[in-house]
Amino acid sequence: GGHLVVIDSAEKWTRVAQLADESGLTYVWIGLYRADSGELAWVKDNVDPVYNWAAGEPSVRDTNGAAENYVLIARRSDGWYYNDCIGDPAAKYPQFYGGKTGYIIEIDP
């Protein structure tokens, strides 16, 4: 089986950022989400995570007040950063996310 990528080491963060750069995308979904408790959780248990949040993130809600329950990495001028996000940003903000969003799947051994 597989799941959205879990970033649990500096080496994996570097590799994910490299893959994201090579993809030509601006946004890439990762395996981090907001659980029912309101806390952020990874799709895989027992993770020692590496975080690289954008300034002001996680913000929990978008500018219109919608809950941001999922996390993607976003390309900025100086690199890739975590950003919490609504579930389907391309539908709500196609000018920013349309055709620019992908994901990285990690296959379990």
Segments (PLM) and residue ranges:
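Extracellular, disulfide-bonded carbohydrate-recognition/adhesion ectodomains
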Residues: 1-109
